[in-house]
Amino acid sequence: MLDKDKAEKALDLAMSQIEKQFGKGAIMRLGNEEALPDIASIPTGSLSLDIALGVGGVPRGRVIEIFGPESSGKTTLALHVISEAQKLGGIAAFVDAEHALDIGYARKLGVKTDDLLVSQPDTGEQALEIAETLVRSGAIDVLVVDSVAALVPKAEIEGDMGDSHMGLQARLMSQALRKLTGIISKSNCCVIFINQIRMKIGVMFGNPETTTGGNALKFYASVRMDIRKIAALKQGNDMIGSRTRVKVVKNKVAPPFKEVEFDILYGEGISKEGDILDLAVERNVVEKSGAWFSYGKERIGQGRENSRLFLKEHPEITAEIREKLVNPQQDAATPGAA
């Protein structure tokens, strides 16, 4: 066994060889908080998720997969990314293979629907050809494909009900991703695939869940996010939204396996104020004493919901707290000082 110094030098040499051969980020220490330098990103609409992703959002020039059960918030999260990209002056496209895009809901999430490019393709091949053409143009900042499960191969659509088409969709995805990854990287476009969950038959041990479309997307995706609804949010007897957990199950641009929770409110999307409040309490930027929440010398509310509404009504205080969370070195400044 090598002594510690020699082992460290040998390890550094091995890591540099791996990075030289396979690119920066092929290997990293899990405890290392530093993400890869110079990675441009698009915010997700949730500050806690941006921090968990390690680069301030979803990375540009990469393939992203968002998967989860039905009604877990997959499309909501993707629409928030589109909204944030548009705020930065970017152009977004939505390949609606499910033919289920709700324009009114997208507008409520802040998407400029007049500027959004939408395609509703007839076949999986058509959807992926359109995606390739848009990405190759170099003008698109974010492209969402909703969803992989709805990318039905032409042969299956033209065939009869009951015909067997084993592995057709997996082959289609594999071929498309082989073509797409290079141009996605060169164009600096963020391509988000939304995916559904299926159950493997006959799995006795381990997780029986799997995603549709074969294994290609699992390999080609730089970031994979597992999104789940964990609780219903109620106001009296009315359901107003859901508590959502996102786990970053794969991340090639920063350490993976981070988990975050936030609220998705019906008709509003991700509750940004609630997300900032939870994160601020966790990082001691906002103090919680009993049911009261205080920021500096000011009490902002009794109970989480009242405090969230206070932040919604006072965007300048929300922006100040957000700045302290994004740049922790400013915590030394007096909290609440305007």
Curated annotation (Swiss-Prot):
Superkingdom of origin: Bacteria
Coiled-coil parts of chain: none
Function: Can catalyze the hydrolysis of ATP in the presence of single-stranded DNA, the ATP-dependent uptake of single-stranded DNA by duplex DNA, and the ATP-dependent hybridization of homologous single-stranded DNAs. It interacts with LexA causing its activation and leading to its autocatalytic cleavage.
Name used for this protein in its record: Protein RecA
An example Gene Ontology biological process: DNA recombination
A Pfam family matched in the record: RecA
Keywords tagged on the record: ATP-binding, Cytoplasm, DNA damage, DNA recombination, DNA repair, DNA-binding, Nucleotide-binding, SOS response
Keyword Plastid on entry: no
One annotated Gene Ontology cellular component of this protein: cytosol
Subcellular location: Cytoplasm
Family the UniProt entry places it in: Belongs to the RecA family.
Gene Ontology terms, MF aspect: ATP binding; ATP hydrolysis activity; ATP-dependent DNA damage sensor activity; damaged DNA binding; single-stranded DNA binding
Presence of the UniProt keyword Nucleotide-binding in the record: yes
UniProt xrefs under InterPro entries: AAA+_ATPase, DNA_recomb/repair_RecA, DNA_recomb/repair_RecA_CS, P-loop_NTPase, RecA-like_C, RecA-like_N, RecA_ATP-bd, RecA_C_sf
Regions that span the bilayer: none
Residue positions binding ATP: 68-75
